[in-house]
Amino acid sequence: MSAKAKILLVNGPNLNLLGRREPGHYGHHTLDSIVQNMKNTANSADVELEHIQSNAEHELIDAIHSTDANFIIINPAAFTHTSVAIRDAILGVAIPFIEVHLSNVHAREPFRHHSYFSDKAVGVICGLGADGYQFALKSAINRLQGPSA
């Protein structure tokens, strides 16, 4: 019997404020509700979902370094535009990943248009709100479980 597939969900700075922080950009869902919905979806697919949210770059890096996950879904938040260190951590562990953003970063301030992750990601989802996380999760599960027999 093969081991259960595992996905690491990484959420960067200020995402702990979802539901009350700039709902025009980020929506009204809390991070807890997004994560719980993802865990329900993962459990239904017999996939384990591990989650970390931190405002501290080194904690995200440590979680990436220590994971035994088969796939990563990451919303680096503000670290998207600044963190070569998190990029290097993901590349260092050689785990495929999908980059997710709640808002459409390309329709916002110019400094948000650049990502240190997008060129290495399997895919990028932005601007679809909380649904983007579900789309990323379903894609990751499909990749891990392969085509149906």
Swiss-Prot record:
Q: Which catalytic residues are annotated?
A: Y26, H101
Q: Which CDD domains match?
A: DHQase_II
A GO MF label: 3-dehydroquinate dehydratase activity
Where is the site described as Transition state stabilizer found in this chain? R21
Q: Which InterPro entries does the record associate with it? A: DHquinase_II (IPR001874), DHquinase_II_CS (IPR018509), DHquinase_II_sf (IPR036441)
Q: What is its EC number?
A: 4.2.1.10
Q: Which UniProt keywords apply?
A: Amino-acid biosynthesis, Aromatic amino acid biosynthesis, Lyase
Binding positions (substrate): N75, H81, D88, L102, S103, R112
Enzymatic class: lyase
Biochemical pathway = Metabolic intermediate biosynthesis; chorismate biosynthesis; chorismate from D-erythrose 4-phosphate and phosphoenolpyruvate: step 3/7
Catalyses:
3-dehydroquinate = 3-dehydroshikimate + H2O
- Its Gene Ontology biological processes? amino acid biosynthetic process; aromatic amino acid family biosynthetic process; chorismate biosynthetic process; quinate catabolic process
Quaternary data? Homododecamer.
Which function does this protein serve? Catalyzes a trans-dehydration via an enolate intermediate.
What family name appears in the similarity comment?
Answer: Belongs to the type-II 3-dehydroquinase family.
User: Mind telling me what this protein is named?
Assistant: 3-dehydroquinate dehydratase
Show the taxonomic lineage. Answer: Bacteria, Pseudomonadati, Pseudomonadota, Gammaproteobacteria, Alteromonadales
